[in-house]
């Protein structure tokens, strides 16, 4: 803030003559700067010592002195920004840049992408919105989920290649023959980000805190109790076998923060700043796995960089650009893929909506070309043909005598593409004689709302990170959507079916059983996927090791910058 005030005062001195020499009294300068004569003399002395201007005072009160400017406010601002970066004051950079929002792109351009600051490799990512606080348990946004995975660790984690759980805070685990006891053996060299040694009691306490959350209690519903059975061992005792347990513990929602300090973890990066304008991560010197190659990663929250009229493809969160938005022609795509996650439609059968009427709605969506012609941005989405690869969408020949209800109600939440989808579906069903009432829930999930209670149709977004089959099991088990899709007996039957699936020790059998559950949901016209996203990551030359993750981000621990040439 001090830099910002000094720049403001310098601009007030400069503006009346646009930088030309001035003959002026100290009193006039004090009035211009909204301060006392004594203070303006201090400002002039400090600015002259810094080499910004020359001030030749005349003896005597009220005498006019000579003021000559040596630098422009623009060059001074840039110098201040560089100085702030070199001293680790990124917040000052953003405050200085906001002085001229029309020039924000030009001002920030030199500081984006990969930079070496004081021999420290730093990656700066411009981002289109403030990040939401990192709360324990489930998080709604992809960026927040990814960030949690960089800051916190779980007892287990998902292998990048196989998508199966492997050791993390626990180096190994053992399961009893009946599947009711799981022993997790902790690494002996674990440290929290604040330098404290990790104790089994810390992790035990945080796990018990997580189980107080309703969604996590539902996720771990088979857990009877958790005990510290040895200073290096945590043991889970179960009511019934749950061969998803290692998967559940590897999911970001089960990652473990310090029991007293919820933003201190054990992950590869520690959180050093979290504001609405800037989020900064620095590598954890005592990380227990492979150390990051970057020292720091920064999210610069700069929404003006992402206005539509700028023509930047990184406006949308599924298209991440690392680097300089003003020079997109120099930024090349380094990784891309189709998301496993999807936007979906669920249908609540009732006296208002029969099975064949629901099937007709789904058939209209998938067979009319509606999804292929949504106006949501070029190459942003692709129509879904399967829930997961190999889990194909059924097709029906709907009898001609099946007519849609006169009225239906649709409730949906973000992302923004579902605005367009809802409007197109409304128009399409109107042509079939069905009036569709649309209700928008302005959130990224179904938490904290009862709007679904009155809905025949519901649309939302199902993010899928690692282990897609397990993620869908977790979705059915924990999402508050499903009690509104089914009546009470059907929902209880669904949960019992999931319980029967989880007791299967063989992974392939579990996957096949879960596939059968979702195939039945699609056959019953309870669920259909709508479209998937094209994930893209672009980076300028010199940012290496960028690998697309299943959430559409990139693994911070693998990115690296070559040393600057001498």
Each PLM stretch: what is its role?
Residues 286-329:
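Ligand-site clamp/hinge motif
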Residues 66, 216-260, 266-273:
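Surface-exposed binding/hinge segments that line
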Residues 350-392, 520-526:
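Periplasmic-binding protein-like
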Residues 19-22, 41-43, 140, 172-215:
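Aromatic- and charge-enriched surface segment that lines or borders ligand/interaction sites
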Residues 475-540:
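Extracytoplasmic/peripheral linker and loop segments enriched in polar/acidic and small residues
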Residues 282-285, 336-360, 373:
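A bilobed periplasmic-binding-protein/Venus flytrap-type ligand-binding module shared by bacterial periplasmic
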Residues 126-175:
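N-terminal lobe/hinge region of extracytoplasmic solute-binding protein
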Residues 539-566:
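Long beta-strand-rich cores associated with HINT superfamily self-processing modules
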């Amino acid at each position: 803030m001090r830099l910002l005030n000094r720049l403001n005062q310098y601009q007030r001195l400069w503006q009346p003559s646009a930088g030309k020499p001035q003959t002026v009294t100290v009193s006039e300068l004090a009035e211009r700067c909204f301060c006392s004569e004594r203070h303006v003399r201090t400002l002039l002395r400090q600015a002259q010592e810094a080499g910004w201007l020359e001030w030749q005072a005349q003896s005597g009160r009220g005498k006019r002195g000579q003021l000559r400017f040596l630098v422009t406010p623009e060059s001074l601002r840039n110098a201040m920004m560089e100085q702030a970066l070199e001293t680790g004051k990124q917040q000052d950079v953003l405050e200085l840049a906001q002085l001229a929002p029309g020039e924000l792109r030009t001002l920030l351009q030199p500081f984006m992408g990969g930079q070496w600051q004081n021999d420290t490799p730093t990656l700066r990512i411009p981002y289109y919105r403030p990040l939401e606080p990192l709360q324990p348990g489930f998080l709604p946004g992809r960026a927040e989920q990814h960030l949690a995975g960089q800051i916190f660790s779980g007892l287990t984690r998902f292998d990048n290649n196989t998508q199966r759980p492997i050791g993390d805070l626990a180096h190994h685990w053992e399961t009893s023959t009946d599947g009711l006891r799981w022993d997790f053996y902790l690494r002996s060299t674990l440290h929290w980000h604040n330098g404290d040694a990790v104790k089994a009691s810390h992790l035990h306490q945080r796990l018990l805190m997580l189980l107080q959350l309703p969604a996590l209690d539902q996720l771990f519903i088979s857990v009877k109790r958790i005990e510290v059975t040895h200073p290096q061992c945590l043991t889970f005792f179960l009511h019934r076998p749950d061969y998803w347990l290692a998967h559940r513990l590897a999911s970001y929602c089960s990652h473990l923060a310090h029991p007293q300090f919820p933003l201190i973890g054990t992950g590869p990066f520690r959180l050093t700043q979290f504001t609405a304008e800037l989020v900064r991560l620095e590598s954890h010197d005592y990380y227990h796995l492979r150390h990051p190659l970057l020292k720091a990663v920064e999210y610069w929250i700069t929404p003006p960089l992402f206005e539509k009229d700028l023509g930047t493809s990184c406006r949308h969160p599924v298209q991440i650009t690392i680097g300089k938005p003003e020079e997109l022609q120099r930024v090349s795509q380094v990784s891309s893929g189709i998301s496993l996650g999807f936007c979906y439609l669920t249908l609540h059968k009732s006296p208002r909506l029969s099975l064949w009427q629901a099937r007709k709605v789904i058939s209209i969506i998938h067979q009319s070309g509606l999804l292929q012609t949504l106006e949501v941005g070029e190459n942003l989405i692709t129509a879904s043909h399967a829930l997961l690869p190999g889990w194909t969408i059924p097709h029906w020949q709907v009898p001609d005598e099946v007519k849609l209800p006169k009225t239906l109600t649709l409730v949906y939440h973000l992302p923004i593409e579902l605005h367009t989808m809802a409007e197109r579906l409304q128009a399409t069903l109107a042509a079939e004689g069905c009036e569709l009432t649309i209700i928008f829930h302005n959130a990224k999930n179904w938490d904290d709302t009862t709007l679904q209670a009155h809905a025949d149709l519901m649309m939302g977004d199902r993010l899928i990170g690692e282990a897609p089959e397990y993620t869908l099991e977790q979705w059915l088990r924990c999402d508050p959507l499903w009690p509104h899709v089914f009546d009470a007996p059907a929902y209880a039957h669904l949960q019992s079916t999931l319980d029967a699936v989880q007791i299967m020790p063989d992974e392939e059998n579990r996957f096949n059983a879960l596939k059968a559950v979702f195939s039945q949901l699609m056959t019953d016209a309870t669920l259909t996927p709508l479209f998937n996203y094209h994930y893209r990551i672009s980076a300028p030359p010199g940012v290496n090791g960028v690998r697309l993750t299943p959430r559409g981000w990139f693994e911070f621990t693998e990115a690296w910058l070559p040393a600057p040439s001498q």
